[in-house]
Amino acid sequence: MEAINEVIEEYETYLDLEGKSPNTIRMYSYYVRRYLEGGGELKARSALRFLAKLRREGYSNKSLNLVVQALRSYFRFEGYDEEAEKLRPPKVPKSLPKSLTREEVRKILSVIPPTKKRDRLIFLLLYGAGLRVSELCNLKKSDVDFERSLIIVRGGKGAKDRVVPIPAFLLEGIKAYLETRDDDSEYLIVEDRRERKDKLSPKTVWYLLKKYGDRAGIRVTPHMLRHSFATHMLENGVDIRAIQELLGHSNLSTTQIYTKVTVEHLRKAQEKARLIEGLIEK
């Protein structure tokens, strides 16, 4: 067990140097540890037996895909590139990202009391700036440029910084929240119920969204708000390359999935209008 701990520690250092996010490092380490503790070897056949075991345990293709990525990464770390290439992730059907309607966004915001300045700010940053939950939690006060009305999102997915302009309403929300703070934490948003004001945790964000979503009768997650940001921007005519930069996507193809969402939105609108049908129906 001690030997495995040492391997995992070195592997995590390798992932960190590769620029992987803390969440990716945590997930990869978890699956590699399970693999090694189960007697896994640096051979593709051994990995396939492990994947078959997880399949029997009920793992979906999407989950198995993550495990394959972790094992391929670990094999490369150990210098077994050829074995890594033999591992092929299962096909995962592409699904359109789920987003909220504008009315649903307004409804959820309406159930967050104006006195809950922190909670409203969390919601508005996820939707109004399209942030990932990890990026939101890592924001520092120094990342807000009040003069130019923008925030600097540092070390997001892929370890790339990006600049996100924010509207005046959101900037005022940040100022209003900071005026309620009497701590010296460097983080923009902190936990409320602790003596020491630690930075906001993803768990808290998920909890708050579930609470207010239940109150509004709408299912909402941090990623759904990010999807909604992108979809609504596209519907408003914003250029897809600008949306790509705002989201921090390295590949345009990742952003282009939102065009499918918008096409579906337009298709439904056309079906509802029934313009052609109205011409030919008696």
Curated annotation (Swiss-Prot):
Give an example GO molecular function: DNA binding
Keywords assigned: Cytoplasm, DNA integration, DNA recombination, DNA-binding
Compartment(s) of residence: Cytoplasm
Q: Does the keyword Cytoplasm apply?
A: yes
Q: Which Pfam families does this chain map to?
A: Phage_int_SAM_1, Phage_integrase
Give the NCBIfam families listed for this entry. recomb_XerA_Arch
The UniProt family comment states: Belongs to the 'phage' integrase family. XerA subfamily.
Its annotated function is as follows:
Site-specific tyrosine recombinase, which acts by catalyzing the cutting and rejoining of the recombining DNA molecules.
Q: What is the protein named? A: Tyrosine recombinase XerA
The species this protein was found in: Thermococcus onnurineus (strain NA1)
Top-down, what is the taxonomic lineage of the species of origin? Archaea, Methanobacteriati, Methanobacteriota, Thermococci, Thermococcales
Gene label? xerA
